[in-house]
């Protein structure tokens, strides 16, 4: 009897350990099967306010409608409302959101203008600052290359003009001097013709 009691006591504690190990496995699998299918609520709220573009601010109901249409939040409306209220309250306390009207999770909400205005110029200034000096350097390089090319033909043109002006008076002066020298030579020719005419007339008179 004592041996059977010892065997029964040894077998009984082993069974619950195996059951406890099997029961622990499904809890780990359940945690892994719950991935978040949407961004954080504060990001969804900011996107909803930007897209709604209401000057007075977006209401909680309008934000909830936008979020449920554009994100996969599930079918549990009570849980979605609870998360949305918490996110709105935290956004106001952390100054990520501005409450334009109402109190708590009720009322209208906006995105701070300073944060939105600071992000847009910062993204716009960086490419503009990089592009402007490059364009200015190219323009100055082109101007420097073009200026000497334009100056060279001007110097050549002025040189040609000086040569032409110097040559033109020399050509006019030479023929004028030659014409003046030839005119007295032609006048001297008739004097030589008059002398032989007088000699021929004297000879026949001597023979008679």
From Swiss-Prot:
<feature type="compositionally biased region" description="Low complexity">
    <location>
        <begin position="114"/>
        <end position="138"/>
    </location>
</feature>
<feature type="region of interest" description="Disordered">
    <location>
        <begin position="101"/>
        <end position="208"/>
    </location>
</feature>
<dbReference type="GO" id="GO:0000781">
    <property type="term" value="C:chromosome, telomeric region"/>
</dbReference>
<keyword id="KW-0963">Cytoplasm</keyword>
<feature type="modified residue" description="N6-methyllysine">
    <location>
        <position position="14"/>
    </location>
</feature>
<dbReference type="GO" id="GO:0061628">
    <property type="term" value="F:histone H3K27me3 reader activity"/>
</dbReference>
<feature type="compositionally biased region" description="Basic residues">
    <location>
        <begin position="144"/>
        <end position="155"/>
    </location>
</feature>
<dbReference type="InterPro" id="IPR036390">
    <property type="entry name" value="WH_DNA-bd_sf"/>
</dbReference>
<comment type="subunit">
    <text>Interacts with nmad-1. Interacts (when monomethylated at Lys-14) with chromobox protein homolog hpl-1; the interaction is direct. Interacts (when monomethylated at Lys-14) with histone H3 (when trimethylated on 'Lys-27'); the interaction is direct.</text>
</comment>
<dbReference type="GO" id="GO:0031492">
    <property type="term" value="F:nucleosomal DNA binding"/>
</dbReference>
<feature type="modified residue" description="N-acetylserine">
    <location>
        <position position="2"/>
    </location>
</feature>
<dbReference type="GO" id="GO:0045910">
    <property type="term" value="P:negative regulation of DNA recombination"/>
</dbReference>
<dbReference type="GO" id="GO:0000786">
    <property type="term" value="C:nucleosome"/>
</dbReference>
<dbReference type="GO" id="GO:0005634">
    <property type="term" value="C:nucleus"/>
</dbReference>
<dbReference type="GO" id="GO:0050830">
    <property type="term" value="P:defense response to Gram-positive bacterium"/>
</dbReference>
<comment type="similarity">
    <text>Belongs to the histone H1/H5 family.</text>
</comment>
<dbReference type="Pfam" id="PF00538">
    <property type="entry name" value="Linker_histone"/>
</dbReference>
<dbReference type="GO" id="GO:0003690">
    <property type="term" value="F:double-stranded DNA binding"/>
</dbReference>
<keyword id="KW-0158">Chromosome</keyword>
<protein>
    <recommendedName>
        <fullName>Histone 24</fullName>
    </recommendedName>
</protein>
<dbReference type="GO" id="GO:0006334">
    <property type="term" value="P:nucleosome assembly"/>
</dbReference>
<feature type="domain" description="H15">
    <location>
        <begin position="37"/>
        <end position="113"/>
    </location>
</feature>
<dbReference type="GO" id="GO:0010629">
    <property type="term" value="P:negative regulation of gene expression"/>
</dbReference>
<dbReference type="GO" id="GO:0005737">
    <property type="term" value="C:cytoplasm"/>
</dbReference>
<keyword id="KW-0007">Acetylation</keyword>
<keyword id="KW-0539">Nucleus</keyword>
<comment type="function">
    <text>Histones H1 are necessary for the condensation of nucleosome chains into higher-order structures. Probably does not act as global transcriptional repressor. Acting in concert with chromobox protein homologs hpl-1 and hpl-2, involved in reproduction, somatic gonad development, male tail development, and vulval cell fate decisions; perhaps as a result of modulating expression of Hox genes mab-5 and egl-5. Plays a role in linking epigenetic regulation with the innate immune response.</text>
</comment>
<keyword id="KW-0488">Methylation</keyword>
<dbReference type="InterPro" id="IPR036388">
    <property type="entry name" value="WH-like_DNA-bd_sf"/>
</dbReference>
<dbReference type="GO" id="GO:0030527">
    <property type="term" value="F:structural constituent of chromatin"/>
</dbReference>
<feature type="compositionally biased region" description="Basic residues">
    <location>
        <begin position="162"/>
        <end position="202"/>
    </location>
</feature>
<dbReference type="InterPro" id="IPR005819">
    <property type="entry name" value="H1/H5"/>
</dbReference>
<dbReference type="InterPro" id="IPR005818">
    <property type="entry name" value="Histone_H1/H5_H15"/>
</dbReference>
<dbReference type="GO" id="GO:0030261">
    <property type="term" value="P:chromosome condensation"/>
</dbReference>
<keyword id="KW-0238">DNA-binding</keyword>
<dbReference type="GO" id="GO:0006338">
    <property type="term" value="P:chromatin remodeling"/>
</dbReference>
